[in-house]
Curated annotation (Swiss-Prot):
GO biological processes: cell population proliferation; cell surface receptor protein tyrosine kinase signaling pathway; cellular response to retinoic acid; negative regulation of apoptotic process; peptidyl-tyrosine autophosphorylation; positive regulation of cardiac muscle cell apoptotic process; positive regulation of neuron projection development; positive regulation of phosphatidylinositol 3-kinase/protein kinase B signal transduction
Modified residues (Phosphotyrosine): 672
Quaternary context: Homodimer; homodimerizes following ligand-binding. Part of a complex including LTK, TNK2 and GRB2, in which GRB2 promotes LTK recruitment by TNK2.
Identification of the protein by name: Leukocyte tyrosine kinase receptor
Chain residue ranges for the region called Disordered: 226-294, 857-888
Source organism per UniProt: Mus musculus
Amino acid sequence: MGCSHRLLLWLGAAGTILCSNSEFQTPFLTPSLLPVLVLNSQEQKVTPTPSKLEPASLPNPLGTRGPWVFNTCGASGRSGPTQTQCDGAYTGSSVMVTVGAAGPLKGVQLWRVPDTGQYLISAYGAAGGKGAQNHLSRAHGIFLSAVFFLRRGEPVYILVGQQGQDACPGGSPESQLVCLGESGEHATTYGTERIPGWRRWAGGGGGGGGATSIFRLRAGEPEPLLVAAGGGGRSYRRRPDRGRTQAVPERLETRAAAPGSGGRGGAAGGGSGWTSRAHSPQAGRSPREGAEGGEGCAEAWAALRWAAAGGFGGGGGACAAGGGGGGYRGGDTSESDLLWADGEDGTSFVHPSGELYLQPLAVTEGHGEVEIRKHPNCSHCPFKDCQWQAELWTAECTCPEGTELAVDNVTCMDLPTTASPLILMGAVVAALALSLLMMCAVLILVNQKCQGLWGTRLPGPELELSKLRSSAIRTAPNPYYCQVGLSPAQPWPLPPGLTEVSPANVTLLRALGHGAFGEVYEGLVTGLPGDSSPLPVAIKTLPELCSHQDELDFLMEALIISKFSHQNIVRCVGLSFRSAPRLILLELMSGGDMKSFLRHSRPHPGQLAPLTMQDLLQLAQDIAQGCHYLEENHFIHRDIAARNCLLSCSGASRVAKIGDFGMARDIYQASYYRKGGRTLLPVKWMPPEALLEGLFTSKTDSWSFGVLLWEIFSLGYMPYPGHTNQEVLDFIATGNRMDPPRNCPGPVYRIMTQCWQHQPELRPDFGSILERIQYCTQDPDVLNSPLPVEPGPILEEEEASRLGNRSLEGLRSPKPLELSSQNLKSWGGGLLGSWLPSGLKTLKPRCLQPQNIWNPTYGSWTPRGPQGEDTGIEHCNGSSSSSIPGIQ
């Protein structure tokens, strides 16, 4: 610029600086250079501007206590806030700032350090704007934090980035129709092809988000301490060919000498860098140029009144492509203004003098923000551990259990002992005697109960199926089902909308395994509304011995499953609750559970891998879609794991579905979700707050999904291999996390670690998880990653994996028996031999050794009966009086 158009006089201690060179770059306005005199080329006179950024005149008093939170003061768009806006926004808080009114510091907030020490500074960059037809999600701004040493009275400059503007609502009726989806680029540009130099389409993209910067002055030059980059703006519409896009990780610069260049751009502007210069109106301005956001492209404003500008902090203005995000280095955007080209995020920065506290993560969905708080220095403590006492404005050392802090606030002293050794000895002897008596009483009761249960036949899938098919009716009352002398169970009325299936229309075929409440069978059902052909289903039943609470839990599971309707959640076909036994009919998932499928799909040396990385990503995407549906319906599953996910088939057209809303035992009992007592906790799938405090939120399932991802990409291995539940609890409580599975792609493992954030609010929701999995499916490096080759045969990681998953493939009835109201009432009986056809052999005896089996999933003991006990399976030293039908 020439002095004939503008002349800036910088008055400071060193003298006067004149602008007379066309290549001159405006120097950064410092407090020592105020007041400023501006020469107006039209009026040709000097007008003084009052000094408002002088450090000695700052109004915020020293000694106030934090934390201090700085925001945009209600400002939005290209320009920053004013002093009046910030005075109103910070009313009632301890934050007092001075806002620049002119020059490069216009909109920048100046704050003084209240005391010398270390401070934790957390910065949030602003998000990018949404496109007209690309509005499902916006590009998140970057968050990061670092620790810096600041001195009392030192001025700190805070530039809070503002969100890039959205394309909608537009500025004209035609653009508003595009926003509503009632018009497109072809209709709105009809007739403009003959205009010379006019492009077919312009506008509809979102502006880039502004960067949030914290800096100070060194020798009159700005020195950035922390820069949180802004998110890029979304394009007019989503990319039609998603296979060529890939997720870009958050970028961080830590070199002080690194260039702060601006992003490349075309019709849409790139984001500004720390030392860049804007070469077009659409490009974002650097802090040296006032940090304003770039303007929307002129073609878009002339055609349809689009005006999506970049946010304050250097966000690039939009055209059809999205604007680039601001940062230490600005984000690029499309130079050819493609309709589907999103603007890129900027690059964040941490000065080498600071200590990075949290890695950058794209989380901000709106305007930027800055939080500054005192960071305690624990170097003087003997155990290097302390807590900040806000009331005393000091760090108090933490002492281990059994000691207390001395008056010097440093030394840990042993607690005084008041009890004499004689009293302690007496207490120990009394406790030992009481423990011995209680142990003897427990052993006596256990012995008596074992003698009473000796020879009792435990129910199994074969026995329960035979009872359901038997015509003999037992009339003895079941004390666990109803009280002696009362009438049989009354029918349960169903809520509206649920399909009632008559027991006469249900045919049992074979046993599939054991569920949460009873056996699960494969069968056929007829007579459904709108379908006359038999439909294969999975039938869940209540066991013979059940309490009233079990019946209520069974009904609750039926109501929950019937409520959901999603392609990735097992569908409820119908219910039968008018007579005992109660039945829940679910769609049959012939592919089995995901854990078993993954274990049997492990590639071996010299064999072609049955699965690809695309197959594993598809399984993860299916379950994530089901979890997203549950999250939108405010439902917390609490037990997302591979064992609870079912597959429609084992072939290439498989679909994974969430199939357990009560299959884990006691999942609806209150004790299941409490720590301690007789609880069943899936320790290896639960976050720290659920294990330690019993807190469950929507982010509980996010943690569990991260563990499920680990199971999928390890091909069915048990999480935290080789560790007990207590070791896992200690492991995650101290901030440790699992290593990636063998050959796991980096972007997939990053999703796992984001799901395993210690703070629940930092974990992504399932909408973000789905978006990141979609990026992985478009990354060639991820898709071409090889699967780990299993060197040997498949081993059982846990003994309990063989329990409850028995598949009786040969168990077939010679003739399917309809489940009539007469034979449904039979829960006992032994007339099984009559079902054996000629030429069929009985089940070969198997030995069962007495043992207790540890369940590594839930942390519970599952007892097995002693040898010779009749458990519904033939033994080595005896034969049953009845045979299992259909075994050859």
